[in-house]
Design a protein with these regions (language model features):
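Beta/alpha (TIM)-barrel catalytic core signal, keyed to glycine-rich beta->alpha loops juxtaposed to Asp/Glu
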Residues: 121-306
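Residues at the N-termini of beta-strands
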Residues: 55, 113-116, 144, 168
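Alpha-helical scaffolding within the catalytic cores
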Residues: 11-18, 66-73, 102-104, 152-156, ...
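Short, acidic/polar
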Residues: 36-49, 94-109, 128, 153-156, ...
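Acidic (Asp/Glu)-rich catalytic clusters
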Residues: 21, 69-81, 103-110, 135-137, ...
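N-terminal binding-site loop/beta-alpha segment at the start of enzyme catalytic domains
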Residues: 1-82, 199, 294-295, 299-306
């Protein structure tokens, strides 16, 4: 297992951090704003920071980076006390578009640096886009860089052939798809595993799952809290999302208990291979939808990316 440190008292003392490959410290639990309406994002981010979150995860394609920046400013926290992640949208996955989009994200977020920038999808000219991340990293615009939704083959490819290997890979990870083998590869490559949809988007009865509920009853916690705690103990960074403050408070309250070997074995057994991926990046229909909806429609001229 990797070691985790605790953030300074000026940030969130109860949230441990993971050291990325270049030494940058990243909180092991953060707040995601996927599908949060732009008009609600500022409030949600401000409340999340008030609750104690110090990692905020957004993306260009979420169309709410500006709200994230406003929420951070409203919080009164110093910029260096909050870890900001955003992602290059599919429409920007060429070298030149990615480079320009990084500057636009900086403008919308209202900051002169981003803590972590990821390529959102392994499509289009992602190698060219990744070179833009490397350049921005060398220029000091990005403290750390990485990828999202890269399956093991693609991850190994980019990790072994780039000057600055990805430091993080954010992939679908939850009780029903824990990605144990992919996690081993990430660890061997020095890549930190981050989970999107740690609650499986509420599917498969996760919040009433009898195994998770039984573990929760043992520790006085909810099924959701057990899920987050188990993933963290598996060395996975988690970014749950909620627009309700009470749920934000519940999701962050996972550092005052630990799961034992029996609990972790029961949790691991939930991944029996029966739950389909929420989004399969090897399904041609999914990729066709992604390209048509997120790339072609974003460019009225219909110009090809490359």
């Amino acid at each position: 297992m990797s070691t985790m440190s605790t953030m300074s008292t000026t940030t969130a003392p109860n949230i441990p951090t993971r050291a990325l490959a270049n030494g940058v410290e990243m909180p092991v639990l953060g707040y995601g704003v996927f599908q949060t309406p732009p008009e609600e994002t500022e409030r949600c981010v401000r409340e999340a920071l008030e609750v104690g979150y110090r990692l905020i995860d957004t993306a260009q394609s979420y169309a709410n980076e500006e709200g994230v920046g406003a929420g951070l400013r409203d919080s009164g926290l110093d910029r260096q006390d909050v870890f900001l992640t955003t992602k290059v949208a599919p429409v920007n996955l060429t070298h030149d578009r990615a480079a320009a989009s990084i500057d636009e994200s900086l403008r919308l977020l209202g900051t002169d640096y981003i803590d972590l920038m990821l390529l959102h999808q392994p499509i289009a000219d992602f190698p060219g886009a990744y070179r833009a991340l490397e350049e921005a990293h060398r220029e000091g615009k990005l403290r750390a860089i990485g990828v999202s939704n890269f399956y093991p083959d693609r991850l190994a490819d980019i990790a072994l052939l780039t000057e600055v290997p990805p430091m993080v890979n954010q992939v679908e990870t939850h009780p029903f798809r824990q990605n144990a083998e992919a996690h081993e590869l990430m660890t061997s490559l020095g890549v930190v595993h981050e989970a999107w949809a740690p609650f499986a988007e509420g599917k498969n009865g996760i919040f009433t799952n009898p195994v998770l509920s039984a573990i929760g009853e043992k520790h006085g916690k909810t099924a959701g809290q057990v899920t987050l705690r188990a993933l963290i103990q598996q060395d996975v960074i988690v970014i749950p999302k909620s627009v309700r403050r009470t749920r934000m408070e519940e999701n962050i309250d996972v550092f005052n208990f630990s799961l034992d070997e029996e609990d972790m074995a029961a949790f691991a057994a939930l991944d029996d291979g029966s739950f389909p991926r929420i989004f399969d990046h090897r399904d041609p229909k999914m990729i066709a939808w992604l390209v048509s909806e997120r790339v072609r429609k974003a460019d009225p001229s219909g110009a090809a990316l490359y």
